[in-house]
Swiss-Prot record:
Pfam family, one: Glutaredoxin
Name the UniProt record assigns to this protein: Glutaredoxin
Gene Ontology BP terms: cell redox homeostasis; cellular response to oxidative stress
Superkingdom as given in the UniProt entry: Bacteria
UniProt organism field: Pseudomonas aeruginosa (strain ATCC 15692 / DSM 22644 / CIP 104116 / JCM 14847 / LMG 12228 / 1C / PRS 101 / PAO1)
Organism lineage string: Bacteria, Pseudomonadati, Pseudomonadota, Gammaproteobacteria, Pseudomonadales
Keyword Kinase: no
Domain Glutaredoxin: 1-84
Amino acid sequence: MPPVVIYTTAWCPYCIRAKQLLQRKGVDFQEIACDGKPELRAELARKAGSTTVPQIWIGETHVGGCDDLHALERAGKLDALLSA
């Protein structure tokens, strides 16, 4: 399974929903908390073109945010991406 990285903040309901989906699927992920860390927000802007959270990567693939992750799941494409 490729590494999964998710940038989050503690108060973000979309971050919680994205993490819950990954946890339900038994996915280990690295969570990078951006709370009060402008340098991480700047890193997000460089990597994702956005500073909104969550931002999720599966391996080298930038998935996007919570809605994007759930759309992959609904389309039946998330498992394939996780097992690549």
